C-alpha cells in the first residue's frame, strides 16, 4: 500500500495527539489486555496498571517487519519498558513475547485467566476510587510527566520518519 504526504499528514496529526491525550487523563488508568497485542500495543502499555490474560502475546507486526519505521510511539514505549537493547531487538525482529515473558520483563503487572481479567480490573479500579481525588490526580500527573517529555521530544520526529518510510516503501514477499 502506498501513501502520499497529504494522506500521512492526518496519521501524523492523530498519532501525535492520541498518545498525549491518553497521558492527559488525570486519574490512574488500568488496561486489561485480553487478546493478541500485535498492533499498537503501546496504547494499553501507557496505563499505570497493566493486566493481561494468561495467553496474551505481544509483537510489533505492523512496522519494521512490514517495511515501516516504528515511529508512532513504539520506538519510545518499548525501549523504555524493556530496556534500550531489548526494546530495539523486539522492534527490529518482530519477536513475539508470550504472557509469562511479558510479566517477567515488566510489560504487564498481573496475568489472569481470561474470565478473571475484567473482574480484577474493576476490583483495582474500585480500590483506587476509594483514595482522595487529589492524591489520584497528582500521582498520575507525576507518573506521566517524564513520558510526556519523551513523547514531546521524539513522537513527532518518529512519526515523520515513519511517514517517509510509508511513502517510499515497497513490501516484498520476504518482509
Language-model features: locations:
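Terminal peptide-recognition signature
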Residues: 28, 44, 102, 139
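Glycine- (often His-adjacent) and acidic-residue-rich active-site loop
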Residues: 1-17, 64-66
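Short, structured loop/turn "capping" segments at alpha-beta junctions
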Residues: 84-88, 97-104, 132
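Short acidic-hydrophobic, aromatic-tinged amphipathic segments that line or gate anion-handling sites
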Residues: 51-52, 108-120
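Glycine-rich phosphate-binding loop at the start of an alpha helix
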Residues: 12, 16, 38-39, 96, ...
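Short secondary-structure boundary segments
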Residues: 55-56, 94, 114-115
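CoA-thioester-processing core
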Residues: 18, 22-24, 32, 37-90, ...
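C-terminal alpha-helix plus adjacent terminal tail
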Residues: 94-99, 119, 123-126, 130-175
